[in-house]
């Protein structure tokens, strides 16, 4: 596993699960609307910079360097909160997005079109208009 030097708090670093390149996904979400904006990659140092500067820093897998969202485009991400998921392998960064989040110039990277999917419906909750049999009996009468 590739690990670049980092100033990340060791207690936070110990909670992270990384891929073979020392990276983990970071989901950027608009803090006030819940809109999912983009997914980038971070390593320990990118997370440290994100936590300590108030700006999202990512690791570019193609350029092999750190980049601060909006540094050249002006489409900045201002950090509102950062949370680690239950498995420790993904972070959710809630941001105030200024301008486009996507490199295409779109607000979000997730507007390239819906995929055909079967839409599921949850079952009707118990007690939603019909009487259920008593526990341990077969169709108990009222």
Swiss-Prot record:
Enzyme Commission code: 3.5.4.19
Lineage top rank: taxon: Bacteria
GO cellular component, one term: cytoplasm
Reactions catalysed: 1-(5-phospho-beta-D-ribosyl)-5'-AMP + H2O = 1-(5-phospho-beta-D-ribosyl)-5-[(5-phospho-beta-D-ribosylamino)methylideneamino]imidazole-4-carboxamide
Compartments where located: Cytoplasm
Cofactor: Mg(2+); Zn(2+)
Protein's name in the database: Phosphoribosyl-AMP cyclohydrolase
Organism encoding this protein: Acidothermus cellulolyticus (strain ATCC 43068 / DSM 8971 / 11B)
Organism lineage: Bacteria, Bacillati, Actinomycetota, Actinomycetes, Acidothermales
